[in-house]
Amino acid sequence: MWLGLAFPDGMILLDNPNAGFITDPMAWPTSTIQADMIYLNAQRAGIGQPEYHLYADKIFRTDQIIIAAYSAQWGLVTPWMLGLNLIMSSLRVCVEWSYGKVKYLFKSLSLKMAQKMIGSRPVDDFICATLFTNCRTCYQLDGPFRTTFGVPPPSIHEYLGQ
């Protein structure tokens, strides 16, 4: 299992491979993403820039990086908290589109029989499919992320590090 993040530019980042029984909140404390975000925010604070945060499901707890959806599980939920959850949930739809796009472009990810026939591991297939989906996103200039967030994807050269 991988901890996955979808960014406003449409790119997907997979981090921190773990055994299948590890949940995202369990994987978060040891992820390189958390360490990178803490470092980045320290750099931004040094030049007077605001911190970056990640919005996450209710299953997460809010910490110095994550802002989790408000849940009665963690205490009283006020009307303004419910309003914020409503606004943020509409933006989270874009996150689900990212993973849906990977599965749409690589339909064999949804078919256990196909994976058995070609002898591949679903995890390896998903990693490759995510890489190719990100490459395709670099060429897509009018996707839902651009429309929703106004953030263009990186060029293919930027993404592949050239």
Stretches with model-predicted labels:
Residues 1-162:
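Short, well-ordered secondary-structure "scaffold" segments embedded in the functional core
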